[in-house]
Amino acid sequence: MKLSKSTLVFSALLVILAAASAAPANQFIKTSCTLTTYPAVCEQSLSAYAKTIQNNPQELASTALQVSLTRTQQAQTFMKRLNKFKGLKARQYAAIHDCLEEVEDSLDRVSRSCDEMKNLSHAKGNDFTFRMSNVETWVSAALTDETTCMDGFAGKGMDGKIKESVRAQVVAVARVTSNALALVNNFAAKHKH
């Protein structure tokens, strides 16, 4: 099948235009991510959504929360599988069970935050402030839940592959949640009276 020159030129123009429109959005994400604790993680986790985010701070914060939600769901799935693992020591089982509860609490808080962010488009004045305060509080509490998860794994008796696997999951979730909190706080600060 032979493509005409005009088809090739048109296709090339579409690719160039798509790249050009994504460039400002990617720059917006990169600049915004400098405000976070983990800028490289922030940029990497959000750049795929540049087309959706554009230069919209609310969309950026909402998308960061969605990334946190997805990552928390993945950690929950991992913890549930690990919780069913045969051959765990009683202390490992208890730590995994407690950690799973913390991850589930975190998941609930981030999910509620995502829902609240969706309702912001209609909120004004005190209603906006109240809703943003909810989001900030819930995301902060979710981050606390995530970091508390590792408490049960303290001590040398808990060292090993189980602890390291859980730690890797928790660190990944905590980083995207921390970044989401920073972006939410930045968005809220720009809209305070």
UniProtKB/Swiss-Prot annotation:
Originating species: Daucus carota
Organism phylogeny: Eukaryota, Viridiplantae, Streptophyta, Embryophyta, Tracheophyta
Protein name in the entry: 21 kDa protein
Name of a matching Pfam family: PMEI
Residues in the signal sequence: 1-22
UniProt cross-references to NCBIfam families, sorted A to Z: PME_inhib (TIGR01614)
Keyword terms, alphabetized: Signal
Alphabetized GO MF terms: enzyme inhibitor activity
